Amino acid sequence: MGPMVRQLVFVGLVGCILVVWNAHADHDVVVAQPRTPIVVTRIYTGPDGQTHAEQIDVKLTPGGGSGELSEMAAVTGLQFRRQAPNYFQDWHPAPRRQYVITLSGRGEIELAGGKKIPLGPGHILLAEDVAGKGHISRGVGSEDRISLFIPLAER
């Protein structure tokens, strides 16, 4: 076998090895991206007696093998609620400090000044406007809104 043939055989073998090795390599490698925060809409009574809103990112810390965890919140119970699509509740404060998580359906709350906050599936609301004028609650869309109330223990 001549030197040219040996060189072609060598190049062919190396090519085959690279193809086989590449076929078994992990191609799902992605560049690390920041994780999307868990966002809570907090409504609270301001010094003016009106309800205001802010977005809060939930602070998470490594939780061992179970992912990331927030601090444990002390709660007093849990309650489900179903509301008709056309529900309307005029100005009212929250009855207590509580999380309200929309599971299905849609609603919105309206604050003084006309600001509306949409409440869709997965939305987490922290209602702390227990004094003052409060907010308006209403249904949006054509299906019942199912939500979960999680009252917080007193601080």
Cite the ranges covered by each PLM segment.
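Bacterial N-terminal signal peptides
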Residues: 10-19
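Ligand-binding loop in jelly-roll beta-barrel domains
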Residues: 76, 114-116, 120-123, 129-155
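A short, N-terminal "cap"/entry segment at the start of jelly-roll beta-barrel domains
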Residues: 25-82
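Short beta-strand segments in beta-sandwich/barrel cores
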Residues: 88-89, 106-110, 124, 155
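Short, conserved beta-strand element in jelly-roll/cupin
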Residues: 92-109
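Conserved short histidine dyad/triad with adjacent acidic residue
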Residues: 57-61, 76-94, 129-132, 154
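Bacterial N-terminal signal peptides that target proteins for export
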Residues: 1-10
